[in-house]
Amino acid sequence: MPSHTFNPQAGYDLAVDRNLGLGEIFYNRAQKSHQAIAVCDGGAVLTYGQLHAKAYRLAQELSQWLRLTEKPVGIVVQHGMADVVAQMAVIYAGGSCAPMDPTLPDNQIQGRLKRLDAVCVLTDQANRHRDLGADVLCIDDFDIADLAPEDTLYPVATNLEHCAYLIHTSGTTAEPKAVQIAARSILHVAFYAPLEPVYDTDVVAHANNSSFDVSLFDIWVPLLRGAQIAVINKAVLLDPPMMAREIDRLGITVMATTTAVLNLAAFIYPKAFAKLRLVTIGGEAANVAAIRIILKNGPPAMLFNAYGPTECCVFCLAHQITPADVEHGSIGVSIGKPVGRTITYIAGDEGGESDQGELWIGGPGVSPGYFRQPEKNLAAFSDLGEAMTSLENPVRFYRTGDIVRRRPNGALEYVGRRDHQVKVRGFRIELEAVEAGLLKTGLFSDAVAMRIEMPQNGAGSILAAYVVPTDVSKPPTMDEALESAKSILPHYMVPQLELVPRLPLNRHLKVDRKQLAELFGRRWEDVSPAQPENASQDVRSALVSLWATVLASPLSTYGDDDDFLHLGGTSLQAAMLINQIRHKFDIEVSLLTLYDNTTLGALTSIIKQRLSGQSETLHNEKDSWVADSEIADDLSCPLDRPIDWCRDTEGRVFLTGGTGFVGAFLLADLLHMPQTSQVRCLVRATDAAVGQERLRAALDKYGLWEDGFADKLVAIAGLLEDDYLGMGREQFEEAASWASVVFHLGARVNYAQPYSLHRASNTLGTRNMVRFACAGRTKAIHYVSSIGCFGPTGSILGTTSVREDEPLLPHITALPYDHGYAQSQWVADALLRRLMDRGFPIAIYRPGFIVGHSQTGACNPDDFLSRLIDACREIGCYPQLPNQRKEFVPVDYVNAAILHIAASPASLGHAYHIVPPTRAVSIDMDNSMALVDRAGNSPMRPVSYKEWVERLAATSPKRLLPLQPMLAERVKDGLTRWELYENMPVYETTNTARALQNYPGGLQFPVLDTSLMKRYLDFLEAKG
C-alpha cells in the first residue's frame, strides 16, 4: 500500500475536466513512469517507455488504413503481451479496438470483421496466415526501437467520448452484437475499481480473454494508474495450485476473475488467492459454499462480488464480501451497490420505481450503443424521460433485462432474467438464435423455432422448429438438415425439425406460431407406431427410434451403454417410453423394469425375453427393506431427556420438507406460533439464497406468505442423503446444538419410481435426521409418514384393523404390490419404530391422503388426487372402486393435530393415525368422485376400472400420463396396484384421540362435502 492516500473522486473529476483520450492519458503516465515495468509476460518485460515506443511504431503502420478516428481495427493475437501492445497501438492511432477470440473459427471472425467494416486486422505470427477476410498487419514484422521519436503525431488526440472498443456479446440473434465502449467508461473503471482503488504499487493479473470486457480492467486500470500488468494464461488459471505459485512469483496483488475460477479454486486449492490484496469475481451468481471455503482458508485481503453487463463496461455494481454474507442461514451474497458515478433504477411491473423489478443502469459506464444497430439501441438504451426528472442533466440508461430486489441496506439482489428466452431441459435458449442458426445452414429460406409442450407423447417441453427448404422441389434429408444444424448450433439448441413448403400467417401477416404449435401436436397424435415385420430381430433399431421420439432428440443412434435417465429422461418420459414399448411390441413390461434396465442394451434384452415368452416376475425386495430398516441400529440412544421445545427460552425448530405441500402449511403454522423463535429449514438448493426463494415461493403458492415471516425463517441449503445433511460437519454440529426440536417431513415422492430411487432421500435421509436429533442437545424428532406404509394389507393379508403402535413387519408381505414410495415409507417407519422401542425420543404421524385447506381451499395441484380429478373430468368418467377409501384429511386438520400432539413431551414413543375420526365421515372413492361431479358441474359417469384404464390409454390426459403404466400394470390376480387397495382396514386412532382430548375447544374434523369440494375445485381452476 502506498504511503499517500488516493481520492478517486478528485482524480476522476480532474481527468474528466481535461477530457483527454486514453492514448494521451497513457502517454502522460509513460512520461512520468518511463522506466517502470508496464507488462510482464513470462520472461519478457516491457517498461512504460517501451510500451509507448511499440505502440507508436505500430500506430505509424496503421495510419495508412486509419484516415479517420474511430475506425474499427480487428485484433487477433494470442493472450499476453502482444494483445496489450496491439490494443495500445490502435488507441494511439485513433482507431477502435475490435479484439477477437483467436480460438474462434475463421468464418466467425470474418463475419464479425465484415459487419464492423474493419479497416484491417492486427495479428501475431501464430495467426498471420489465417483466412480472416481483411488486410493483415502482423505485429511481429516490425523491429521496434525502445524509444519513439519525440513528436506529437501519436497518440492521436481524441477525447473521452472516443469509441475505444467494440466488444462482442451474445444477443437475441445468432449474430453477436458489437457493444461500443467509450473512453469515459474505461476511465470510470480505472478510478473506481470497483470500490477499492488500484495503486501504482500494485501488480494486476491479466487473466481474461481480450474479447471479453473484463480484460479492460486487466489492461487499462493498471496502465492508467501506473501499476504493472502480469500475464496469466488460461492453463495456469485452471490449475489453482499453479496459479497460486504464479501469483507469488509475479507478485500479483490485484485480480479480476470469474465466479467459476473461484469455485474451482475453493474445492481444489482454497489458499490460491491468499496473497492477493484485491480479488473481484463476477459473471454468474456467487457460490456461497465456495466463498465460505475461501474465506476460511486464506482469503485475499478484500474480495468483491461485482456485476456489470458489457453494455455498462466491466463493473457497475459491487459488494465487498464478508463472512456474514456466507454464514449458514444468510440470504446470500448481493450484487452490491452502484460503483462510482453509476446510477440504478428499478422499474416495477406497474410502472414507476420499485424495490423489485427490472434493473436499469445509468452513468459514465453506459455504452453509446450497439454498433450500427439503431433499432436495438432504441430498445436497450434510454434517458427514462419523466422517471428521471430529479436529475440535473439527462443520463443515458441501459435496460439490463435482469430482475433485482433491493435489500433494506440498499444493496441489490439478483433475482432472474426477463427477455425473450425459453427453458428447455434445463437450458436457457433464445429462439431467434436457433432460427438464425438454421438459416445459416443455407438449406432453409425461413425458420420458426418454438418451445412446445408435448401432452401427447409425454416428452415434456421440447425445442422444435418449422423450416421451409430453400429448394422446395429438392428438400434436404433429415440427416443432412440435422448434421448441418449441429455444425452451427450447440447441441442443446438443435431442434426437432419439421419441413413445410411455407409458414402460415395470421391476420396481422405475421407467422402464426399458435397454428404451428397445434399442427405439431396433431402430427404427434397421428403417429401410430407400426409393429416391425420381425420384432424379435429388429428390437434394437425399433427401440432406438422410440428413444429418439420420447427424448425429443434429433439423435439417430444410441450406444448399448447409453442410459435413458442420463440422457435426460424424466419420469414423464419414462412413462411414455413404457407405453410406446407396450404398443410397439405387444408385450407387458413394467415401469419398474425400465428403472432397473435403463441402458439401451439392457432394455433391448428385456424386450427380447418378453417376446420369447418369458413373463415378468414381481419385484420383491423384502430382504433389502428389512435390512435397511436396521441401518440406524448402531446409533446410541441419548441418555438425556429431550428438550421441551415450547419452553420460553427455546422454540428453535429444525424443519425438513418446507417446500412441499404439507410442509409449507406446517411451516406457516410454526411461524405463527408465539412459542417459535426461529425456524431453520433444510432445503435442496445450491445455496441459502436460493433455498430462501424456494421457501417463499412455496408459501406464496398457497397464499401463506407474510412479510413478518422473514424475521423468523432461515433456509439452509442441504441434502437429506448426506451424512451431515449437506451442511458440512461444522454447520451440522452447530445446528444440532442450536435446535430445540426436529420436524421431519422431507422426502422424495414419486409413485412411478422404484424403492431404489427413493432410498437415498427417504431411508438414508431418515437415519441422518435421527443422527442430527441425537447430536448436540437431545431433541425430539417428529416424523410425518402416512398410512401408506402398511401397503394394501387389507387385500393381501385380510387385515381388518391396524393399531397405531403395532409392529410393521407383518405388513411387509403387502408391500411388493405397492409403489416404491410406499415401500420407502415402510422402511423409514420401521427404522424409527425400532429406535422408539429402544427409548429414542420419536413420534410418528401417519395421516391419510392429505387434501386442501378446509377454509381457503388451497390444495396441491400436483398431487395424485388433483391429477386424477383433472383426467377424469377431461375424459368424462371415473373408475368404480368399491370399498376403497383414501382417508381424506384436510391439511389444516392434520397440522393442527400434529402441532398439538408434538407440544406435549408425553407424545413421544408413539405413532398417531391422523384420519377421519369415525367411519361415518370417511368418504370412499366412489362418493368422492361423485362429489367432484356435483361440485364441478362436469358430467362424469362411473365405469369399470378396466374401461377407465382403456379410456386413459386412448386419450392420454397429460396430468396422469406419468402414472399411466403404474395404473394399468396388473401385479396380482389380474388386479392393479390401485385395485388392491380395496377392502382397506380401519386405521385405529386410540393414541390420536387421547392426545387430542385437551385440544382447546376440541379439534373439529372438516367433512368432505360438496361445498368443500367446490372450494378445492375453485382453487385448482384459479391455478390453471
UniProtKB/Swiss-Prot annotation:
InterPro entries xrefs: ACP-like_sf, AMP-bd_C_sf, AMP-dep_synth/lig_dom, ANL_N_sf, Far_NAD-bd, NAD(P)-bd_dom_sf, PP-bd_ACP, Thioester_reductase-like_dom
Annotated disulfide bonds: none
Annotated TM spans: none
Cofactor(s) annotated in UniProt: pantetheine 4'-phosphate
Similarity comment text for this entry: Belongs to the NRP synthetase family.
Task of the protein: Non-canonical nonribosomal peptide synthetase; part of the gene cluster that mediates the biosynthesis of the alkaloid (-)-FR901483, a potent immunosuppressant that shows efficacy in animal models and a probable inhibitor of purine nucleotide biosynthesis by targeting phosphoribosylpyrophosphate amidotransferase (PPAT). Within the pathway, FrzA catalyzes the reduction of L-tyrosine via its C-terminal reductase domain to produce L-tyrosinal. The biosynthesis of (-)-FR901483 starts with the condensation of two L-tyrosines to yield (S,S)-dityrosyl-piperazine.
Name of protein: Non-canonical nonribosomal peptide synthetase FrzA
Organism this protein belongs to: Cladobotryum sp
Organismal lineage: Eukaryota, Fungi, Dikarya, Ascomycota, Pezizomycotina
Gene name of this polypeptide: FrzA
